Structures are given as C-alpha cells and as structure tokens.
Amino acid sequence: CFNLYSSKHISACAIPRVKVDDKPEPFKNATSILNWWSSIEQRSIELSLKYRYMFMTDITNCFGQINPESISWALARKDTPHETNENEELASNIRHYLRAMQEGRNIGIPQGSALFSLIAEIILGYADMLLAKEICECQKNGSLPEDLEYDVLRYVDDYRIFCNDSEALDKISYMLQHILERFNFRMHSSKTRTSYELITDSIKPDKAFYIFNTPIVSKQTYLEEDGKERKVPGYDFDGFQKHLLFIYEFSRRFPNSGQLVRQLEEFSKRVETQL
C-alpha cells in the first residue's frame, strides 16, 4: 500500500515504524522523536542547500476532521493509475467499527493509537498520490515547468514544500489546499506561510529558541589524565550542529563582527581537537 503512495518528489516521513529489538526506549516516544529529527529537521536542513523557498503548513484538527468515507477512497486509490476495488470490504468494516466506537458519529477518528495513526497515514498518503498526479499533469500541459525541481516532506499533517520557483511553489500550495479540502481538511492559517530562512525555520520554534538563547562559550572543565587534573575548553552543547546553528544566528544579527570571527575560530579549534 505505502509503496504505491511513494513518489520521487513527495516523502511521507511518519509511516508507522516497528522497533527491531525488544529493548525499552530510553524515554517515551523516542523512536518517533528520532524519526522527526532525521526525516524532517535534518532533511529540511539538507534541502535548504538546494532550494530558496519553503512553504510550511499543517492541518487544523486533522484526526477530528477525517471523513470516514475517505477511507474507502484511499484504499481504492480512486482517480489514480492504481485504482482497485479489492479493499471494499476492508474499508466498509473499518467505517462500521468507527461508527460503533463513536456512537454513530460520522466524522473524525480517535487519536493516540497506532492503529488510527495508520488509518490517517493511509488517507494522507492517498492525498500525496493525488498531489503528485496533479503536479505531473500541470507539467505536461505547461502550467508548471516540465523540468521543475521540488520536494515535499510530510510528517502526518505537517507539510513542507521546497522549490526555487516562487510562482510554482504558490501553485503547488494551492493544489495541496484544494486536494485537502476534498477530504474535509483545512490548513491552519496561523501556521501557513512561505519561508525564506530555510535553515532556522527547519527547526521547531521551541528548539530553536533554546539553541539560540543558550550561550555556547568556552568554559573550564577539570579532567583527570594520568592522575593529574588539567583544564580544557568545554561547550554548552555537545554536538557540532547546534554550535553551528548558534553561530549562524549570531552572524545574521552581527555580520562581520569581531565576536563572530572569535566564535568561528573557537569552532575551528573545537573541530581540530576531534580530528
């Protein structure tokens, strides 16, 4: 099912995963958090090296607005080259049990269960298929450049669309909006925008605030070596990437400053000590 939903330019990053071992996670939802970090944050930063613009949005009350009828459309892959009627009985059973669970309520699905996350992913994956199909048709009829480069990352109901052509990006975002409306979905107005600061906006706002407001300065740490204590430089963040993000934000506010040069020199020394 999910293999058919895959597209060269559209990546579904929240397909439910199963741990390969029985070891307990170090903290709740560790697998999901790591998946978000690698497939959304890190991939977005990678794409920022290729693209100039990023459209960001998410769906308002996604699970609560799901139309159960769309389960049938998704499992049938309606209006796509892979349309099938093999899953009619499965779709009917899912809708039946959903109505029973919700005392006849015919809109929305429960949230918080891996099963319902899977159902939502099937529906949103089908929406990805429709978006890829519509973009392809627009490239064929000339309303979008045939050689258009773009990438779409979706993590459940969180979308990021990357492109170097601002007009094409607007068209793709409108296509997405119209497709989502067919599923009774609405874009969250306060979270919908086009970003020109792809590096900083690739990171969740709370995490970015923490990074940019925690000073990464040299401090003295005592370590024992050969029975002796010595002072070595230490840093508030262990990882190089967060250190670089701090320097990047500092350079935006104070370009060509002496402090910026000093921070770059300190970072260079830090890298040298690890080589």
Locate each region found by the language model:
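Right-hand nucleic-acid polymerase module
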Residues: S39, I45, Y53, T57, ...
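Conserved two-metal-ion catalytic palm core of "right-hand" nucleic acid polymerases
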Residues: C1-Q111
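Short, glycine/acidic-rich hinge or "gate" loops at secondary-structure transitions
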Residues: Y5-C13, E83-N93, C136-L153, H188-T194
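Amphipathic alpha-helical scaffolding segments
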Residues: E69-P81, G125-M129, M175-L180, S195
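Active-site palm subdomain of RNA-directed nucleic acid polymerases
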Residues: E83, L118-V156, I161-K171
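Short, flexible loop/turn elements at secondary-structure junctions
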Residues: I59-F63, I123, C163-D165, T194, ...
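Conserved catalytic core of two-metal-ion nucleotidyltransferases
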Residues: E181-P215
